Amino acid sequence: VFNPNSGKAQLKNSLMKIIQIFSNADYEVTVYPTKAALDGYEKIKAAKGLYDIIVCSGGDGTLNEVVSAVITYGDEKVPIGYIPSGSTNDFAKSLGIPSDKIRAAYNVVSGESFSCDIGIINDRRYFNYVAAFGAFTDVAYETPQDLKNMFGHQAYVIEGAKRLLNLKAYKMKVTSSRLDIEDNFIYG
């Protein structure tokens, strides 16, 4: 499952080589390009039980769709390989997954599997990287793909900066064993 629009749409330059890496490792490869948000989720839902491994390439959002579908539809034992091709690939960086797509593909076919924590919110929404709230939490989702393709990580900074003029402060009281504070705060 891959998102052909993620990052700067550079996966297309490596896709045939990646397929060859899996084919040379005796994997029977099925390739599915996503067409819209949650498309990868639906594809994995429909393919429950058909694959021994699921590999995805895209950004953090594509990976989250795949992880959520695998867990939701009862295929938790199926390993997930990840070839990062998003704008920032924060999750991959945090786990030491190579940013080079070819190295990441070799890593999937020859690397050791590992477990990572998956969280769930309200018994229905899984997350593998970040669960957040505050003034800028929608920036990653609201940043237009064409901006991400053009500017990479800086697109998020631009989108976040647009929100600065609309920030609202909320009167709050924070109490802990070490301090009591009452003031106006901005969720950020």
Whereabouts are the PLM-identified features?
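Gly/Ser-rich catalytic serine loop of serine hydrolases
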Residues: G59-D60, G86
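Short Gly/Thr/Asp-enriched flexible loops that form oxyanion-binding sites at enzyme active sites
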Residues: T62-D75
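Catalytic core of DAGKc-family lipid kinases
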Residues: A25, Y32-T34, Y73-G188
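ATP/NTP phosphate-donor binding region
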Residues: V1-S57, N64
